[in-house]
Amino acid sequence: MGMPAAKKGDTITATDVHFIQPPGTAPPTTVQHPFKGRINGNLSANVNIMGKPAAMMNSTATNTPAHQPIGGTFVKPPANRGSIIAGSPTVFINGKPAARSGDTAITCNDPVDLPVGKVVAKGTVFIG
């Protein structure tokens, strides 16, 4: 059986790691930050899932609330963006793999963005 199809308003979740510069002369440290972004960009203009634009590979999410520095300042300000990098191998929307619950997303991390995010979708439309 397939997985729920992703659409506008579904989420990408992850745990991101960012470098924080503590006050004074201490070296930067890594701090984990939760990522929870609503899928809201690069959606299909002509395919809807449950009345909302369908998500596909390369659809994006904005982390809300944005990451906040804990114990100092960010060495590099986070982008607070996620992008779906995997989808269905058999179902395509506008020529791109359809996104489903459980598909992988890349999210903002230091020193480089990493594929640690997962799509979380609910609904009545399932895609294999």
Regions picked out by a protein language model, each given a short descriptive name:
Residues 1-128:
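Intrinsically disordered, low-complexity proline/glycine-rich segments
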